[in-house]
Amino acid sequence: MSSISLKEIIPPQPSTQRNFTTHLSYDPTTNAIAYPCGKSAFVRCLDDGDSKVPPVVQFTGHGSSVVTTVKFSPIKGSQYLCSGDESGKVIVWGWTFDKESNSVEVNVKSEFQVLAGPISDISWDFEGRRLCVVGEGRDNFGVFISWDSGNSLGEVSGHSQRINACHLKQSRPMRSMTVGDDGSVVFYQGPPFKFSASDRTHHKQGSFVRDVEFSPDSGEFVITVGSDRKISCFDGKSGEFLKYIEDDQEPVQGGIFALSWLDSQKFATVGADATIRVWDVTTSKCVQKWTLDKQQLGNQQVGVVATGNGRIISLSLDGTLNFYELGHDEVLKTISGHNKGITALTVNPLISGSYDGRIMEWSSSSMHQDHSNLIVSLDNSKAQEYSSISWDDTLKVNGITKHEFGSQPKVASANNDGFTAVLTNDDDLLILQSFTGDIIKSVRLNSPGSAVSLSQNYVAVGLEEGNTIQVFKLSDLEVSFDLKTPLRAKPSYISISPSETYIAAGDVMGKILLYDLQSREVKTSRWAFHTSKINAISWKPAEKGANEEEIEEDLVATGSLDTNIFIYSVKRPMKIIKALNAHKDGVNNLLWETPSTLVSSGADACIKRWNVVLE
């Protein structure tokens, strides 16, 4: 039986927001980190190669809400996590991995609406039974609850503004501490957890206190950090202020966003001065530091987590994960990628572009901030170079501007011969040389266009008025004809088959018409299984038969805003191969990498490879 199965996920980077902390979580059992990105929570395994845990787990159970924080349960081997979102809901969930089928099953254990605003941090107790959840709200800024029933286990009080972070001491006697935008540090004893003490004097008045964490094992110390550049050390059992951690030889030059303990003596801090520092709590000395280029705003460090054996992962504002180890002066490795929806994709080699203007070359793992706005199209038909068109009105080659458009390019399509067709907001159809930016031909359309496809000899344009498809000859744009049957709704994507025998045209309602280009008649109108806007149509590459003749074109892969991927057949229009819920919030791009492999990207900032088995 024919099927599509998930082969690989290239996960996005953690979501970041300027002037806010992104809390990372680490699980030593699976050697994985957890973080939020968009409306999904991700678990990313740090092991290379064969492993008993999946490389990536994606949890999409928060619906339409943006996920703000994800934390592992501290119980060894439990595989439970708790995630919170901007609506104030927390969900406890777990996963199971079937290595034979390479499939991950996610199970929701419990979910609770706990706050009236975004959740900023979650902390588990060391028994894996209690949760402290904090953030913004109307009546309260946090709760203590049991993970399974949601019953209240105390009261979060003493704050007048948003709480930024919380931590439960990972040993008895149980203690907790919360820190917030009002500059206050509040200490609790429990369970049930009650207000014990509040400190508003050891962080500068009016500053934001951004993170807090008890030392591991006995919890002898608890550290708080904030925008006032101060590192305050408190007693873990009584909550009394002990001292500031400061080193005259190593002044902190920017607000501190996050901290993480490496062991019971050393902890790491990261901040807006693009520096990662490791401190000794007893001597108050900075024992090691790593500094990135401070001139780059994207190098501000907004998150950190210790991963054991003196290793640290820090998070840059641009989403890059940086790996460090005590005793090594240089970064061990970095992981870059997208953390916004991917809007353009090309394969062989794999290059992707997202709506924040970022372009990622996956073969060399290099990230480029070439544009300041959404990437419309990419062309990699020339070796060692790529051409990109963006809503910032430019065509660039490897980041160098080659053409500036008079009006914004709406949609674009590249063929493999180094040419790109562009529709602009001024209703111009432009044919450009992809790698020089020269306009080869242009024509003014009679009505606004919403989709375009370029092949070797033709340019097909979907027109908004009348929902018709107009086909131009590439050799002479003055010569054109309309396909006889219009679409049922506004055209959203067009694809001319490689042999130029067919044109597949999709609309915003999810229906696809297949036209025969020679007769200009509809070949089939039965490709109607999508329920929302068609975002991608890709023809399966032609294969050679036994006698070296090319096998007739048959299969077409389609991706839609309805999150699904379908493969339709020209010969058998009612035959369909499905991959449902392929991308949270919709499939944006879909291409055949090989005759048996599809590559897709979506609004969830993921890139996925799919195995296609045909029978």
Curated annotation (Swiss-Prot):
PROSITE patterns hit by this protein: WD_REPEATS_2, WD_REPEATS_REGION
GO CC terms in record: actin cortical patch; actin filament; cortical actin cytoskeleton; cytoplasm; mating projection tip; nucleus
Principal location class: cytoplasm
Keywords: Acetylation, Actin-binding, Cytoplasm, Cytoskeleton, Repeat, WD repeat
Single GO biological process annotation from the record: barbed-end actin filament capping
Subcellular location: Cytoplasm, Cytoskeleton; Cytoplasm, Cytoskeleton, Actin patch
Annotated function: Involved in the depolymerization of actin filaments. Enhances the filament disassembly activity of cofilin and restricts cofilin localization to cortical actin patches.
Protein name, as recorded: Actin-interacting protein 1
